[in-house]
Amino acid sequence: PTNPLRPENLLKDAFRAYERERYDSLFTVTGNDKKFGKIVDNKFIPFTYKIGQRSQDLEPLFFENGLLYITKAKLIFEDIIISKDALPYEVNHTFANVDIDTQEDFDYAAFLFKKMY
């Protein structure tokens, strides 16, 4: 994984939900409060909101954060990690926003780790 940081008890709590709800897969997501848009012909086109819309009034959106995937073995043998009816397990923790792709990302993750522990 490109994010080795995990909130304490994430696996235990997520696995409990996975078993309780009887899904065949689970993946973690995090709420998104950013105002996304596209740049087309040097113009910004809002994608997830309307100009002037307050952040707190945005439609709740989520992103796959890559912290944890739980999948039944039979699905993995079919090259399926996230099934159509997978449980999106919400994790809103500082670690969910860390993605280590560069040295700067690694330095930031190390800083967070030291600060938290």
Which residues are covered by each model-predicted region?
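Conserved core of the sugar-phosphate nucleotidyltransferase
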Residues: 3-92
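Hydrophobic helical membrane-anchoring modules
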Residues: 90, 95-117
